[in-house]
């Protein structure tokens, strides 16, 4: 099982709307994430816009590819792009960070 953590930056003027959108994630998007192997997935957002994501999956590259192949993910990413500081698709611009310690 891969444990994946990633960082991104949400625009400060869009924090409230970004939070609101994630209180009501589309059912089709949730189903696609599960079907693609995304488990124990969490997103954390600091007041300065720092976003930290965490998920567990058997194969991260395969899980990314499976999501990239879905229409619902393409629509979701297109809508979410405007919330992020960096341009481009949010799911392609995340900075994955290395795990250096784990305690079970």
Question: Which positions does each model-derived feature cover?
Answer:
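Basic/polar N-terminal segments that are highly enriched at the extreme N-terminus
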Residues: 1-3, 102-104
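Active-site-flanking beta-strand signature of metal-NTP-handling nucleotidyl enzymes
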Residues: 4-9
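Short amphipathic alpha-helical segments
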Residues: 14-39
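Short acidic, gly/pro-rich beta-turn/loop elements at beta-sheet edges
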Residues: 16-18, 53, 63-65
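Short, glycine- and small/hydrophobic-rich beta-strand elements in well-ordered beta-sheets
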Residues: 30-52, 56-58
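An amphipathic, aromatic/His-enriched active-site/gating alpha helix that lines ligand/cofactor pockets
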Residues: 36, 57-94
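Eukaryote-biased recognition of C-terminal alpha-helical segments
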Residues: 95-102
């Amino acid at each position: 099982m891969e444990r994946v953590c990633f960082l991104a930056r949400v625009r400060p003027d869009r924090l409230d709307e970004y939070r609101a959108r994630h209180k009501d994630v589309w059912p089709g998007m949730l189903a696609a994430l599960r079907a693609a192997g995304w488990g124990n997935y969490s997103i954390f957002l600091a007041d300065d816009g720092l976003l930290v994501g965490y998920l567990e999956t058997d194969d991260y590259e395969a899980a990314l590819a499976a999501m990239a192949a879905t229409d619902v993910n393409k629509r979701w990413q297109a809508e979410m792009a405007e919330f992020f500081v960096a341009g481009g698709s949010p799911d392609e611009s995340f900075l994955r960070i290395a795990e250096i310690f784990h305690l079970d």
